[in-house]
Amino acid sequence: MRRGRAPTFLLGGGAALLLSLFWMPTLLPAASRLLLLPRALLSMASGSPPAQPSSSSRSAYVPGSVSAAFVTCPNEKVAKEIARAVVEKRLACVNLVPQITSIYEWKGKIEEDSEVLMMIKTQSSLVPALTDFVRSVHPYEVAEVIALPVEQGNSPYLQWVRQVTESVPDSSTAPL
């Protein structure tokens, strides 16, 4: 699947929220997205960035040090096999979103498939290794592996992602 690039003016303020409202429609009902639309538009129009957390709630998370990657699989069995393997290799943690519909052009023909979406969180430095591994085990001729840096989020969760994807296992690390 191919999508056009967002114009560069959509990179700051409420633009990220605005873009995300339409980027993952299967995960957020339309009514919920519409309720968030005015906030995104107001933030963009005012030119002010979204409210930042107070210094007491901030931690040592470095923006962009964790990435969210997306991989589509033909079925749940394949998705679970790949997910377990990347977790065992300490490359990532994974959520599976079943029953998505993908519509795309392949070899000159419009295709429509039911797939499973893997939402993968990993250290940004591990994205190349994750991509190589997924490509080596994925059944598709051209596996979808796309990754975006995570600029903000729940710092304890993002720190946990970094812990569970470190190369040396830590016996004190427990999933949340």
Curated annotation (Swiss-Prot):
- Domain of life assignment: Eukaryota
Q: Where in the sequence is the signal peptide annotated?
A: 1-30
Which keywords annotate this record?
Signal
A biological process term (GO) from this entry: response to metal ion
Which Pfam families does the record match to this protein? CutA1
* SUPFAM superfamilies per record: GlnB-like (SSF54913)
Name a GO molecular-function annotation. copper ion binding
Report the coiled-coil segments: none
Q: Which family does it belong to?
A: Belongs to the CutA family.
How this chain assembles, per its entry, is: Homotrimer.
Q: Function, please?
A: May form part of a complex of membrane proteins attached to acetylcholinesterase (AChE).
Under what name is this protein listed? Protein CutA
